Amino acid sequence: MYLEPRPGIAWPSLPLRELKGAGKIVVDTTNQFAAANPWRGRYDVGDLTGSEWVAERLPGARIVKAFNTLFAAFIAGDPRHEEGRQAVFYAGDDADAKAAVAALLDEFGFAALDLGGLREGGRLM
């Protein structure tokens, strides 16, 4: 499993050769921002969601989008609180890959919430 911790502005530098094929699970944490400041625009990926765009560039890899709705400080801290566990949304088109990511989120202490496939869930995130 590969967790992609870069911002969307780093998409061009994804290690494509290492991540293609072989059924590797890639956790896409990015957003479509063209700059660190989201008010400066988004990458134009046409009708695709950002994760669908990433999936097209990584044939054979199993993409699961997660962590992109949280600031780093919320990910780094303990997600278990007196009020309950912090939620992390995830989405993907491969059921086994999603199950693996959900298990990892649970192990980290997060409450994992499945938003469906990359198309539907990606648009919600």
Regions from the PLM with identified roles:
Residues 7-8, 48, 94-95:
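Alpha-helix N-cap/helix-start capping motif
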Residues 18-20, 43-45, 107:
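Glycine-rich, phosphate-binding/catalytic loops in enzymes
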